[in-house]
């Protein structure tokens, strides 16, 4: 009987070994969290307004006068492009070209970014104008007798105007981070995502609604709160009242 029991045990061990070889009974391992649920380290540009265009160009925007000055002083190169509006409180927008030709699609997205994150958002309009210049045309040297406020610049030379640029942005989660910017650059590849337009809700109330909508799609609430809390969502919203666009 002892020999028979050992023989059966050997047969059972052999069967398990064969199953492992065939991939039928792989040893259990701790499942790695999907990349979607991994919070990544913040990038240097995330202290500004920013997004990557659908063509892969990094676009920066100042949050206030101090960050406008920092972008100009540290990150604007002559080979870059800059966008601005004529309205007070305008976003200083920089397209980091890396010496490459910038497609029209990126310019259009940068224009939407520039007007949507400016004070024009709260003006009750559906669209606004902005203009494009080369990095070398932007200066902090005023004309004789003039004075420049902090965050303001002098633009010299020709400007290319973008007329009737529509307002509208999207917020979404992609690669473990909350992102925001033009719909065409943000919504594809982001899950969840929402579109924002000028409306009746203040930033805090809208951020709470966005958070609730995101929480319906993201099962890991701790992860969601770590990258897209209400306060973090507020940082991606334009100035002035807004609402979630019906889609």
Task: Tell me what each language-model feature is.
Residues 1-247:
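Extended, highly charged segments
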């Amino acid at each position: 009987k002892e020999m028979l029991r050992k023989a059966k045990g050997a047969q059972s061990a052999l069967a398990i070994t064969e199953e492992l070889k065939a991939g039928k009974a792989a040893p259990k391992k701790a499942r790695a969290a999907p990349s979607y649920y991994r919070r990544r380290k913040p990038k240097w540009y995330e202290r500004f307004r920013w997004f990557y265009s659908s063509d892969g160009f990094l676009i920066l925007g100042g949050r206030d006068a101090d960050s406008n000055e920092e972008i100009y002083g540290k990150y604007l190169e002559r080979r870059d492009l800059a966008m601005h509006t004529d309205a007070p409180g305008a976003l200083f927008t920089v397209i980091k070209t890396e010496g490459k030709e910038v497609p029209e699609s990126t310019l259009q997205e940068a224009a939407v970014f520039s007007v949507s994150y400016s004070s024009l958002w709260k003006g009750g309009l559906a669209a606004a104008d902005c203009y494009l210049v080369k990095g070398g045309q932007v200066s902090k040297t005023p004309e004789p007798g003039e004075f420049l406020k902090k965050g303001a610049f002098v633009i010299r030379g020709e400007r290319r105007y973008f007329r009737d640029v529509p307002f509208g942005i999207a917020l979404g989660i992609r690669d473990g981070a909350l992102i925001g910017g033009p719909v065409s650059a943000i919504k594809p590849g982001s899950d969840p995502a929402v579109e924002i337009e000028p409306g009746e809700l203040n930033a805090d109330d809208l951020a709470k609604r966005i958070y609730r909508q995101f929480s319906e799609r993201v099962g890991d609430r701790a992860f969601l709160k770590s990258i897209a809390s209400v306060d973090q969502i507020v940082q991606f919203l334009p100035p002035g009242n807004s609402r979630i666009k019906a889609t």
